[in-house]
């Protein structure tokens, strides 16, 4: 399945099969016909009221109106910026300062934040869609125009707006539709906030292939009793998730192919897929295809992927991050020089996946983006190596610490801890003293055990861990928790854990 234009591919379903379901809520099912009608109306309103090319903000949660605004903005030649409702006020203010949007579609009530942008309330948005004024033909979208802007965290505390073009998105969607078992009309679970680019992995492959999205409300995601009561009734076929969230799901004994028999495809992105998690999924969902993918926001969601099978798990000690998509090249570099095949270095991505850089931030763009072999390239900050065309992840460069002179990859310890029989899930963070790493602290979700005292459990974990890592990699302190904290994007909240251990 190959598409030539994102907007036309989505609109085709609205014209060909207007009654086909596109967005399935608990009490309402929206159709492709409604999506086309509403997005056309929004595009017409934008064309009439603001100059082409200026970004617009779409503020809300997982709602149909968000989709209509995304598509309407794109049709009219505007990049959209998704901001999740309840985002901290200070972060919203910083995004507005950087982005200078012309208009804000407030699908949820807009907070008391001053802005020069015109604010379109949900009531006014509904009126725009209901009136559906006849507009002139829309100017065709150019592939280099920006499709969306997603703001990621910046090292200085100011968010960076990653600009993804129509061409970037088209390349990604065609790859997912071709390589990951997606067929026409599949039903996707919509879980990730639209302000997180993981959502792009379900949103656009679903819409361009005539599929449907079933949004999962936050209150359901955070209430596992409700989630696992509801899940078998939804007939979900494709689930895009972070490994951390899936780890929590796998704690539920009934989360398997027998009780949730509709699932056909799992897609993972956003962080490393632990081998223990992958093994559980292979064992529990023999009927499903499981894919591990890799890529930063700056390279349009993901650029490499591999199907996770028992044979793959038997061959590799760590789940590979896959083979690189055809229109993209990965270089392994140290100090901007390519290393020998099989050596570890920084993963540098070049080609069709690489974004246009950071919005209104030439300094940060110049630091991370450059031209290499005639192609746009991006320094990921991830360590890895290429072996026989397979990309192997070796952790974040900025998750590497030095303790007593040894360079330690924290995610490597996480990986080995997750393989200890007493451990369900773990995250290791450094504790600092006078700007130097004093010790390693492990936060652990433990499996059921017979130890009466925590120190005996810790002793047993250390003994088993010592069989696979060097002594200097064994955490000095263990903190036992019922659940590791997650960010809004579903990743382990390492910053929060670091703040906790370094607050005392």
Regions found by a protein language model. Name each.
Residues 1-149, 164, 275-278, 326-329, ...:
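AMP-binding/adenylate-forming domain of the ANL superfamily
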Residues 5-7, 104-139, 169, 289-292, ...:
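AMP-dependent adenylate-forming
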Residues 31-33, 147-174:
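Conserved AMP-binding A3 loop
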Residues 41, 60-64, 78-97, 108-110, ...:
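ATP-dependent adenylate-forming carboxylate-activation enzymes
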Residues 60-63, 84, 182, 192-196, ...:
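Conserved AMP-binding
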Residues 160-189, 197-237:
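Conserved AMP-binding/adenylation subdomain of ANL enzymes
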Residues 209-211, 236-240, 250-316:
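Gly/Ser/Thr-rich phosphate-binding loop
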